């Protein structure tokens, strides 16, 4: 039910702000790879959680959607230590590792911070690789994906 509520809320916000404004904002965000591959997926995961965060990808140009989804899927896991609301269904992975750290008498906070920081870097690298892979596949298959945002 919460996913449905978040999706309805997002659609209401889109209607209130207007699709043209959302499109222009998405166009500005998609220009810069750091924003597109690091900041936007993290904000989507933090605000909407998994799986509702994937709906924000609809505002990005078709060419950048694969890298956004790749980064977002990874952010949903690597942010769990500090922000368990993002992906509560898979919190057991972090908690299993954290219980081993606690058994050693160590704090889990540094582990969660390192997990997040390493995740931020590796997710961005994965998204960049996905951008190159998308360009390669498009070139080989003769498909041209749009680099301008359009919402239907």
What spans do the regions from the language model cover?
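Membrane-embedded alpha-helical segments and adjacent helix-loop junctions characteristic
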Residues: 1-61
